[in-house]
Structure formats: structure tokens, C-alpha cells
Amino acid sequence: DIQMTQTTSSLSASLGDRVTISCSASQSIGNYLBWYQQKPDGTVKLLIYYTSSLHSGVPSRFSGSGSGTDYSLTISBLZPZBIATYYCQQYSKLPRTFGGGTKLEIKR
């Protein structure tokens, strides 16, 4: 199985900040990477598919980039509703596998 690693498990930032969350794969996944947002209430939403394509209804403050084994999700102008845990998922090879998640919190 392909192992997905999110080295930062938690991240604290201020409102208005630009935040980047990283994800790496144990082998090249050819841009077959999605990003998901899980809110504190458990709601899960697809944000980005195929590395950089914004899912319908997702604010343009969210963007994705990367290639090969290294990928990132960037949130510009952080807003309160962005507080969540973010997961990368590869679908280059079955089984689909997820990173361990990065929990984003507001710095007080």
C-alpha cells in the first residue's frame, strides 16, 4: 500500500493568515491526490481533487499544488470556519490511503 504522511499533526494560525499543509507519498502518485476537510462536528467535505482542482462550492481561498510524492494545501486569508482537520488521500493505486490529518486551530 502507498503510505501517506502528514508530518504536522496540528497547526495554530491567526485569522487572516496564509496556511500551508503538506502531505507526502511513499511513491509517486501522479497527481492523483484529494484533500478533505473534517469539521469538529464530524462533517467531511471534499475540497480539492486531482491535486489542484477546486471542488464545486469551495471558496477560492483554498488551493492545492504538488507533483510526484510531495503535495500541499494552502488556505489564504484564514477564516473561523476553516477550523477543522485536513486530510490528504491518494487514489493512484488501490487501496486508497489517507494521511494522518493536520488539525488547524486559531491562535489566541
UniProtKB/Swiss-Prot annotation:
Coiled-coil spans are none
Q: Give the residue ranges for region: Framework-2.
A: 35-49
User: Where in this protein does the record put region Complementarity-determining-1?
Assistant: 24-34
The keyword Disulfide bond is annotated on this UniProt entry: yes
Q: List the disulfide bonds.
A: 23-88
One GO biological-process annotation of the entry reads: adaptive immune response
Alphabetized Pfam families for the sequence: V-set (PF07686)
Matching InterPro entries, A to Z?
Ig-like_dom, Ig-like_dom_sf, Ig-like_fold, Ig_sub, Ig_V-set, IgV_Light_Chain
Species lineage = Eukaryota, Metazoa, Chordata, Craniata, Vertebrata
CDD domains listed in its UniProt record: IgV_L_kappa
Would the keyword Disulfide bond be found if you checked this record's keyword annotation?
yes
Protein name stated in the entry: Ig kappa chain V-V region MOPC 173
Q: Name a single GO cellular component.
A: immunoglobulin complex
Which keywords fit this entry according to its UniProt record? Answer: Adaptive immunity, Disulfide bond, Immunity, Immunoglobulin
Q: Where is this region: Complementarity-determining-3?
A: 89-97
